[in-house]
């Protein structure tokens, strides 16, 4: 049986009481409803407080827990104790899970047991909550009644908390000291340049900081690091330098403060090296042959410099032509840029107009539905693959109207992940109210009946659609007049249909799933009832 439910479509956690209420309603075979928040989360996930209640209280009691308060299933202290007609006590979540997984029988004596036969054992609950327990946090010696344990843990100085910088767990009483003095990711300033960095990066930074003090390896002078290259090249008196005449063949190297003495002592040898280099250069230059003909016989009749002047003149003309062409191209580029900007404005305006027209067409189409809308979800195989890969799958339908005038609604479909508690591998289906054209003329909150159907697309004469019907509950926020384009609160079924059931018939055809929504407001609810399909009541199973 599907669980009728209003859930938070943003994936936010429900409170402990909401989760328990939903489970209780499910165990009685009824549809539990609550508000839902629309968003992009992948599935409806159980809150952390509910997950803690899957089994009994796993705490150390002082004195030790009596066996009569132990759950026979989880062997822990009874949480939300319930009693069976055969007199056995169980955790509420444990026995419900046992009935659903192992069948309708008592795990102790195998007596027939239905969920609606369970009743709360408030006496045992009070007794257990009054028992003394030890704080589970290491180092804490506090004892308190079980009912106060959660409040104590929220303030216990020995509770573990993650460091916001390095993410390692520490007890709350030691966390501040760790953050300020011990955390390797704590921010510290460089003593030289005042740049802030993580403590674990400080050593590497100090090895490269441009303002850090360093000592010259030759003269032991202390300078900042960015001055050291110039010091080596120009100032250091003991840095090794080559002889000034190294280009002429002197390969001696000495300290800079010894260079002057070296030049003075080796003046003659340096002069010989220079003379030899000049002589070698002179021999490398070939002699100019003498002319044997008169000069006027070897020179053309034109002036010697006329050819050069002509070339220069041609170059000047070419440069002027290129400059003129460059100016014209610059003007053309500016004109084209201006035209492009104007056309871009026109294109953007056309896009806005097209979007407006598309919205109007969609609005007109939505108004023609008259309360019956068939949602075609294409590429459904891709959505199923994403669900198997634990990727979020949340899809919203276009808006549609219940009539003209009428309320504007939309549907939201979740594919619950395989890891989801209690609703793994289910299709969740919800309805949201939307801001519509006629909202100011309609009575609020919305009242009526909604039938949700996944259509069988087989060619059989009798098609077996999967459908559920629900009555609106005006007191819920899901049916109030929306104040934003889509009401964040939704109403529907967390476990509308199992994916395994989806594959057993031709619900998916041509990679398309068809979801039908039929809405009857309070003015035309008789149509559904004439068909003999009565909505489920939250009290029908009690």
Curated annotation (Swiss-Prot):
Pathway: Protein modification; protein ubiquitination. SUPFAM superfamilies: RING/U-box, TRAF domain-like. Residues 1-374 are annotated as: Interaction with TAX1BP1. This is TNF receptor-associated factor 6. Residues 310-368 form a coiled coil. GO terms for molecular function: histone deacetylase binding; identical protein binding; protein kinase B binding; signaling adaptor activity; tumor necrosis factor receptor binding; ubiquitin conjugating enzyme binding; ubiquitin protein ligase activity; ubiquitin-protein transferase activity. A zinc finger (RING-type) spans 71-110. A zinc finger (TRAF-type) spans 151-203, 204-260. Belongs to the TNF receptor-associated factor family. A subfamily. GO terms for biological process: antigen processing and presentation of exogenous peptide antigen via MHC class II; antiviral innate immune response; autophagosome assembly; bone resorption; canonical NF-kappaB signal transduction; CD40 signaling pathway; cytoplasmic pattern recognition receptor signaling pathway; DNA damage response. The coiled coil domain mediates homo- and hetero-oligomerization. The MATH/TRAF domain binds to receptor cytoplasmic domains. It is an enzyme of class 2 (transferase). GO terms for cellular component: CD40 receptor complex; cell cortex; cytoplasm; cytoplasmic side of plasma membrane; cytosol; glutamatergic synapse; lipid droplet; nucleus. It catalyses: S-ubiquitinyl-[E2 ubiquitin-conjugating enzyme]-L-cysteine + [acceptor protein]-L-lysine = [E2 ubiquitin-conjugating enzyme]-L-cysteine + N(6)-ubiquitinyl-[acceptor protein]-L-lysine.
